C-alpha cells in the first residue's frame, strides 16, 4: 500500500513536469530498451537520438542509463546460464579504462570526432569479418590479446559518452561467431557490469542522474518488463542464420550513423 502511494505521488509529479511528447518518448524508449536487452538490439537505433531531442543530449544519457540497468538485470535473469564469462572478463579492464578516457577528453575534444574515428574502425572490422565469412577464412586477429582490448576500450568510451556501445559489442561478438543465445547472454552480462559501474560516474561526475530522473525510471519499470518479454518471444522465433543477418544489417546501419 505504501509503495502504491509513493508511486502515485511520483506519477503526479512527473505528469506536472513532462509534456505529452516527452511522455510518449519515454514510454516508447522504455519498451524498446526492454526489447533490445533481451535480443532485438537494433531497435535502440532510433531511441538514443529521439530521447536526445526530447530531453536534451546530456540529460537523456542520465534518463536512459538506469532503464538500461533495469533491462540488463532482466536479461541476465533470463540468460544467466548461457554467457561465456571468459569473453566478458577479457573486455572489462579496457572498458573501464575507456570510462576514464571519456571523462578526461569530455571537455577537450568534440564527441563527434571520436565517434567518427570509432565508426571507421568498426567499419574496417566489419569488412574483415564479412570477408572472412564469405571466403571461409578464419579471422586470426580475434585470438590476439589486443583484439579484445581494443574493443573493450572502444566499448567503454562510447557507452560513457552516449550509451552507444551496442555496435562495438556487435562487431566483436559477430567476429567471434557466437551463437544466438550465447551472443545475447554475453551482451547481457557485459552491459550489466558496465552500466552499473557507470552509474556513480554519471551521477557524481557529470551530474546526469537526478532524483527526479530516477523517479521517472521507476515509473517505467513495468513498461521495460513488457518490452523484455516481447524481446524474448521474438528471439525465440528467429532462426540462427536470420538472427545473425539481422544483427549484421543493424550493426552496419549503426556504424554508418556513427560516421555521418
Question: Where would I find each of the regions flagged by the language model?
Answer:
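Small-residue-enriched transmembrane helix starts and helix-helix packing motifs
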Residues: 14-35, 142-156
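Membrane-interface helix termini and inter-helical loops of multi-pass transporters
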Residues: 15, 103-113, 203-215
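Small-residue-rich hydrophobic segments that form or flank transmembrane alpha-helices
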Residues: 24-89, 151, 166-221
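Hydrophobic/small/kink-forming positions within alpha-helical transmembrane segments
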Residues: 69, 73, 92-100, 130, ...
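Transmembrane helix exit motif
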Residues: 74-82, 117-143, 232-233, 255-260
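Hydrophobic alpha-helical transmembrane segments in multi-pass integral membrane proteins
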Residues: 156-164, 198, 254-260
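Interfacial loop-to-transmembrane junctions
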Residues: 231-250
Amino acid at each position: 500500500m505504501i509503495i502504491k502511494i509513493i508511486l502515485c505521488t511520483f506519477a503526479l509529479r512527473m505528469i506536472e513536469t513532462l509534456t505529452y511528447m516527452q511522455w510518449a518518448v519515454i514510454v516508447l524508449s522504455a519498451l524498446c530498451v526492454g526489447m533490445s536487452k533481451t535480443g532485438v538490439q537494433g531497435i535502440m537505433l532510433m531511441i538514443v537520438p529521439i530521447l536526445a531531442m526530447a530531453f536534451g543530449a546530456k540529460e537523456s544519457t542520465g534518463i536512459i542509463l538506469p532503464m538500461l540497468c533495469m533491462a540488463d538485470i532482466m536479461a541476465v535473469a533470463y540468460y544467466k546460464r548461457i554467457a561465456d564469462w571468459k569473453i566478458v572478463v577479457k573486455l572489462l579492464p579496457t572498458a573501464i579504462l575507456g570510462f576514464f578516457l571519456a571523462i578526461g577528453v569530455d571537455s577537450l575534444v568534440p564527441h563527434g570526432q571520436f565517434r567518427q574515428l570509432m565508426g571507421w574502425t568498426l567499419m574496417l572490422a566489419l569488412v574483415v569479418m564479412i570477408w572472412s565469412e564469405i571466403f571461409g577464412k578464419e579471422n586470426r586477429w580475434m585470438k590476439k590479446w589486443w583484439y579484445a582490448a581494443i574493443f573493450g576500450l572502444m566499448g567503454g568510451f562510447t557507452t560513457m559518452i552516449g550509451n552507444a556501445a551496442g555496435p562495438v559489442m556487435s562487431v566483436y561478438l559477430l567476429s567471434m561467431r557466437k551463437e544466438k543465445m550465447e551472443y545475447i547472454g554475453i551482451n547481457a552480462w557485459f552491459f550489466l557490469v558496465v552500466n552499473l559501474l557507470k552509474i556513480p560516474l554519471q551521477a557524481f561526475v557529470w551530474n546526469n542522474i537526478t532524483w527526479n530522473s530516477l523517479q521517472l525510471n521507476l515509473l517505467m519499470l513495468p513498461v521495460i518488463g513488457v518490452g523484455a518479454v516481447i524481446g524474448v518471444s521474438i528471439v525465440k522465433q528467429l532462426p540462427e542464420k536470420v538472427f545473425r543477418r539481422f544483427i549484421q544489417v543493424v550493426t552496419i546501419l549503426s556504424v554508418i550513423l556513427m560516421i555521418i
